[in-house]
Amino acid sequence: MLYIVGLGLGDERDITVRGLDAVRGCSKVYMEAYTSLLSLGLDPAALANLEKLYGKEITVADREMVEERVDQVLLEAADTDVAFLVVGDPFGATTHTDLVVRAKKMGVQVKVIHNASVMNAIGVCGLQLFRYGETISIPFFTEEWRPDSFYEKNSNNSRLGLHTLCLFDIRVKDQHGNSLA
């Protein structure tokens, strides 16, 4: 069984009771560090805090692992209980939806444990949630890749009088200066 467990938005203590029970019952635990990071980061001390509270050794799943080697995780989950921890809510990123689809195709059972995400926490801004238009992702540009689709989406939201939630890309392995948004 693959448990995809949302950790919420704060620190290691924001996991739900159901999520903590699932993690403690798993043979293997992965922490996805590609789409987002907990506020405490993932340096060795922060990882040790997670491991101490959860009572499990945690393997960090970076972008390469999530995009290229996640089938290894799914093969493990076919034989034993595996937890895949994600910041926020599991379905806050298409990456995790893809993981569920791939697991189902491989015959791996999946249980999703939801938590708070940026998508429902934006109400703290005081803006009305039902007045948000399409959410946009703003990636890092490279010399070869400079997408501009988010400009049009933002313009459409503005034209309709809607707020826009902007999700900024992060560079987990390159944490200096402006690499984290």
Predicted regions: what they are:
Residues 88-164:
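Class I SAM-dependent methyltransferase SAM-binding "motif I" and its flanking Rossmann-like core
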Residues 31, 66-69, 121, 130, ...:
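Residues in flexible loops and secondary-structure boundaries
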Residues 62, 128-131, 181:
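Short, solvent-exposed coil/turn linker segments
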Residues 1-109:
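Class I S-adenosyl-L-methionine
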Residues 41-43, 113, 117, 179-181:
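Secondary-structure junction/capping motif
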Residues 73-76, 150-156, 181:
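A short, acidic, amphipathic alpha-helical segment used as a generic capping/interface helix at domain edges
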Residues 35, 116-118, 170-172:
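Short beta-alpha junction loops
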Residues 2, 81-82, 158-181:
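A contiguous loop/helix-start segment that scaffolds small-molecule binding in enzyme catalytic cores
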